[in-house]
């Protein structure tokens, strides 16, 4: 029977908020506390003073382990080292720039218990197919969600079941760099899991914070997702995805029967705003049709079929 473990990559420039971040995940910070290890992955070329700081983090919770890993993998180190050492475990990746709501882990684990063969993700990144056979990855940080103005936040927190990357290029450093420059780990993991025909289930577009959110957690300069998510960069990565893996991805996604069973905080507002709401990686669509009135259901189906988001 596999364990559930947490895995995070961090760097010295993130020390300022790391303690708060970790405390939101341990010692009663979460309603789910059943994970067996919390791996904090750091580069193997840091100063001694940095390692001393990280080693002290183990005093917070006895499940915390500090893993020194090859820094050249950059943001992919949130998953790569633990995929190698814990191949039979389910791995939840957590970011070091988020103060996690109390039910973040529980929501992932509950969905995983019902869908053991799927990746479970809090963040939904749409993927669309063009008439000329191209796959287009849409970074969700380019989607202007009004809910973000009301204390909502996007996060890459995800649960990866055991062996979803078996037989893929996920450990191929040269291909990872050719595709992402080490900046967009989520693209690398999406490509490889999709090539393995692994479905992804999204819990909703955004996570809600409980209580008052400290303003510094909204600091765009602090959050790597905002630094890495420039629209011009996304166009570059889309070109690379299609060059390296486009035909295989297109064939898999275009022949996939999508289920519409994931909910959103404000489904009506979302349908009003977006024409391209819906490919969750190669996984399931973002809304629950049963929550719609008949008129809104027809409007929703017309929109997504018109834009060739899914085969309904």
Feature-to-residue mapping (PLM):
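Short beta-strand-to-loop acidic/aromatic patch adjacent to the donor-nucleotide binding site
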Residues: 89-97
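C-terminal catalytic/acceptor-binding lobe
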Residues: 17, 21, 174-311
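Short, acidic, metal-binding catalytic loop of nucleotide-sugar glycosyltransferases
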Residues: 23-35
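Active-site-proximal specificity loops/subdomain of glycosyltransferases
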Residues: 43-88
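N-proximal low-complexity "stem/linker" segments adjacent to membrane-targeting elements
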Residues: 1-24
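Short beta-strand/turn micro-motifs composed of small residues
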Residues: 8-10, 42-44, 121, 204
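Residues at the starts of beta-strands that form the adenosine-phosphate
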Residues: 3, 36-37, 90, 199
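Conserved catalytic core of nucleotide-sugar-dependent glycosyltransferases
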Residues: 101-174
């Amino acid at each position: 029977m596999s364990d559930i473990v947490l895995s995070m990559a961090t760097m010295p420039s993130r020390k300022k908020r790391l303690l708060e971040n970790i405390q939101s995940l341990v010692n009663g910070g979460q309603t789910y506390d059943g994970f067996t290890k919390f791996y904090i992955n750091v580069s193997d070329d840091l100063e001694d003073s940095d390692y001393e700081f990280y080693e002290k983090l183990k005093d917070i919770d006895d499940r915390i382990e500090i893993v020194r890993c090859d820094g050249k993998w950059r943001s992919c180190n949130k998953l790569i080292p633990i995929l190698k050492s814990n191949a039979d475990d389910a791995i939840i990746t957590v970011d070091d720039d988020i103060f996690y709501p109390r039910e973040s882990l529980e929501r992932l684990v509950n969905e995983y218990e019902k869908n053991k063969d799927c990746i479970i993700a809090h963040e939904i990144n749409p993927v669309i197919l063009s008439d000329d056979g191209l796959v287009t990855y849409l970074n969700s940080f380019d989607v202007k969600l009004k809910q973000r103005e009301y204390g909502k936040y996007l996060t890459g927190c995800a649960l990866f079941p055991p062996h979803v990357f078996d037989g893929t290029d996920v450990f191929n450093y040269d291909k990872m760099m050719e595709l992402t420059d080490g900046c967009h780990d989520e693209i690398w993991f999406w490509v490889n899991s999709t090539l393995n025909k692994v479905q992804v289930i999204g819990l909703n577009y955004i996570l809600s914070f409980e209580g008052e959110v400290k303003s510094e957690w909204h600091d765009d300069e602090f959050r790597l997702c905002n630094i890495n998510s420039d629209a011009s960069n996304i166009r570059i990565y889309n070109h690379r995805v299609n060059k390296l893996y486009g035909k295989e991805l297109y064939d898999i996604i275009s022949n996939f029967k999508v289920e519409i069973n994931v909910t959103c905080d404000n489904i009506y507002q979302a349908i009003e705003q977006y024409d391209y709401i819906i490919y969750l990686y190669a996984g399931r669509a973002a809304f629950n049709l049963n929550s719609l009135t008949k008129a809104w259901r027809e409007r929703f189906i017309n929109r997504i079929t018109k834009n060739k988001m899914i085969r309904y």
